[in-house]
Amino acid sequence: MKRIFLFLATNLAIIVVLSIVLRLLGVERILDESGTNLNLNALLIFAAVFGFGGSFISLAISKWMAKKTMRVHVIEQPRNSTEQWLLETVRRQAREAGIGMPEVGIFNSPDPNAFATGMSKNNALVAVSTGLMDRMNADEVEAVLGHEVAHVANGDMVTLALIQGVVNTFVIFLARVVGHFVDRVVFKNEQGHGPAFWITTIVAEIVFAILASIIVMWFSRQREFRADAGGARLAGREKMISALEKLRAVHTPSQMPDQMAAFGIRGGMGQGLKKLFMSHPPLEERIMALKAMQR
């Protein structure tokens, strides 16, 4: 579950870097028809290619990046009974969910957390923190693992990549329309694209990407409810509720890097506008949704 902010940050970085490289190479000149007006058809194709390209590059490297960022120890040969139990539990849940066996790992953090990421249902990683293993009993850890396996089985990362690709396309498209307008109307540049276009486009990309993340975060919150339900089916509803209640009782701040904080099962807390940018619903809402499920 530690996937959203790292995915978004990687996407934004790729879009900005691509914009800089393309500008330096002069590729963006194809978007200026006759030196006066934008070729909107070419712009839309350009935006879609690089919007979806950035999104799927992020997806392709998500597992590798998560391993490096969180220093995950992937369990290949179990060193103890705990690692053996983790492998057996994930293997059983993956079989029940109808997916290939994910890699299973542990990362060192006092923060009770877990995440799933990967390119596809059959090429995924499920990892838990040492803090989660220390603070939760076996039933609760089983429920958390079920939640993460459900994310993989639901294809959340691929779906997120598609949504992010659409969002990226509009961000790139609209940013260049705004840049073109500022360059022509405000700075009265009548030929080609001047510095105003370049600067405005980069700033607009960042602003639009932040605003567009509200859409992605809303989607993420809905998928969390679905993953909770999946975890309840794989491990048992009471176990899933107990795990979330244990997380709610934890008041220590997250020890994850800022760009990874929303990937974890704990999620975050926020009210008002801040809630729009949360990748997870409040734990209270998630617990209520589970309790409302039919037994």
Swiss-Prot record:
An individual GO BP term: proteolysis
Alphabetized UniProt keyword annotations: Cell inner membrane, Cell membrane, Hydrolase, Membrane, Metal-binding, Metalloprotease, Protease, Stress response, Transmembrane, Transmembrane helix, Zinc
Enzyme Commission designation: 3.4.24.-
GO CC annotations on file: plasma membrane
GO molecular-function terms, A-Z: metalloendopeptidase activity; zinc ion binding
Enzyme class: hydrolase
Spans through the membrane: 4-24, 42-62, 155-175, 197-217
Entry cofactors: Zn(2+)
Domain of life of the source: Bacteria
Active site (UniProt): E148
Entry binding sites for Zn(2+): H147, H151, E224
Membrane-topology descriptor: Multi-pass membrane protein
Record NCBIfam families: PRK05457.1
Similarity annotation: Belongs to the peptidase M48B family.
Protein name: Protease HtpX
Natural source organism: Thioalkalivibrio sulfidiphilus (strain HL-EbGR7)
